[in-house]
């Protein structure tokens, strides 16, 4: 089972395409949607929804995959549920870069402060990151340096921020899920 968490653009047709591509790894791909506008509510909703979905699966190695803001949540929700995560062009600092896009971006800082202290140290090797060299949204070199002590980092020379084509990375994602 793969949980797919969309980015800030929840209605992008690319989300369906990424889910279809992920079905080459596991036919059971589930979209876990969230508002993107209310971080505290989103966190509670995602925790409940993932726990509910996991009760109805016998997959020994479920995986969370998120793009952009979805990767922010995939890392945290995955950690809190003991799941591996794939973070694609993760938005690591929505409290800074979501100003003007959502009502209360400061809630992300509050979530970070309330999360398990040093959770990345406790989550080491339980996530893999895929970064676009040509990400038009974020400085991925900086973000990769924040995560490289904890997670493996893969680079893509072709894909933009929304990462419409996962094909080149599907074998690594599958190996990570099954390892």
From Swiss-Prot:
- Pfam families, per the entry: UPF0227
Coiled-coil blocks: none
Q: Name the residues that span the membrane.
A: none
- Which InterPro entries does this chain map to? AB_hydrolase_fold, UPF0227, UPF0227/Esterase_YqiA
- Specify the superkingdom: Bacteria
Show the Gene3D superfamilies listed in the entry.
alpha/beta hydrolase (3.40.50.1820)
PANTHER family with a match to the protein in the record? ESTERASE YQIA-RELATED, UPF0227 PROTEIN YCFP
Q: Which family, according to UniProt?
A: Belongs to the UPF0227 family.
Q: Which HAMAP family match?
A: UPF0227
The entry's protein name is UPF0227 protein Sbal223_1944
- The species this protein belongs to is Shewanella baltica (strain OS223)
